């Protein structure tokens, strides 16, 4: 995805900044280097470039392998649910992020110049931005689906097509909002003679309004929607639990109490909510520093110092980290992947048939793919 850098900052770096795979980055990120001796800066950045390449390769491998495991786990399930569908969509998005965003960044760092034709430049940039939007909007869709599962459980059971509709809208908006990228970016020769897939702005001042709009469409507005939705979900769960405590304390009919218990929010749904919240918290932790840094930088709030550059390099690694973390979160919540088989066989040998059946039923209910 396009990096928000001016040509002047590119000359200072002599390479593409870390998160070349995102449309929101830092403007004139190393202007402080004008005060440094050129030789000192060159040796400093060369060593840093090697570390960044190692980091990118690690993130790429973890992202592809981790999400491949998730896709294999969800696809081999005979009993699929709406939560399985959303987990699959998230894994698909993260996998393409690794292939199109992280891998192209690695290739670009090795080649230096952009070797492909102008059309490839525009298409690659477009797909990178599509994936950025999609990764956010899939989370919004997941939040809406969990809201309906908790607040309107009866309608939720009747609306099996809702998940596909939500994902369809998420991807449609992603492709639509990314169209300006096809116009903004193109292959160009910079004043230092290097050929790059770069923004074709008539003036660098265009970056500030453009990147501000992108930041709100990609991050701030979706985050506000997600926060409101999960606020309502938590409120609904709390109210139902309070009502449950009151009814149970006053309940004298055993059959009536059992019937009421069956109408409560299931443990499976609660675990799905926990899984969704952890995924969203990971998204917030990885992307908040990045977008906040970009907004402050676009409005010239940050000083031109070495510390600013060091911070920017670390911050620009966080978004790529998000696609590698998601499958690890799924692994933690899914006992089907992380449970040691030998331990289970040992436990099975000491259990009665009834105990094994009850444990198997609880494992099915606890897996996010069956929620």
Swiss-Prot record:
Transmembrane segments annotated in the record for this chain: 53-73, 83-103, 124-144, 165-185, 213-233, 276-296, 313-333
GO cellular component term of the entry, any: plasma membrane
Residues carrying covalently attached carbohydrate according to the record: 4, 13
Disulfide linkage: 121-197
Regions of this protein lying in the Extracellular compartment: 1-52, 104-123, 186-212, 297-312
Record's subcellular location: Cell membrane
Gene3D superfamilies for the chain: Rhodopsin 7-helix transmembrane proteins
Topology within the bilayer: Multi-pass membrane protein
Induction: Increased expression in lung after ovalbumin induction in a mouse model of ovalbumin-induced lung inflammation.
Keywords: Cell membrane, Disulfide bond, G-protein coupled receptor, Glycoprotein, Membrane, Receptor, Transducer, Transmembrane, Transmembrane helix
Record GO terms (molecular function): neuropeptide receptor activity; vasopressin receptor activity
Topological domains annotated Cytoplasmic: 74-82, 145-164, 234-275, 334-371
Biological process annotations from GO: eating behavior; negative regulation of defecation; negative regulation of eating behavior; neuropeptide signaling pathway; positive regulation of ERK1 and ERK2 cascade; positive regulation of release of sequestered calcium ion into cytosol; righting reflex
Function: G-protein coupled receptor for neuropeptide S (NPS). Promotes mobilization of intracellular Ca(2+) stores. Inhibits cell growth in response to NPS binding. Involved in pathogenesis of asthma and other IgE-mediated diseases.
UniProt family annotation: Belongs to the G-protein coupled receptor 1 family. Vasopressin/oxytocin receptor subfamily.
Protein name: Neuropeptide S receptor
Organism encoding this protein: Mus musculus
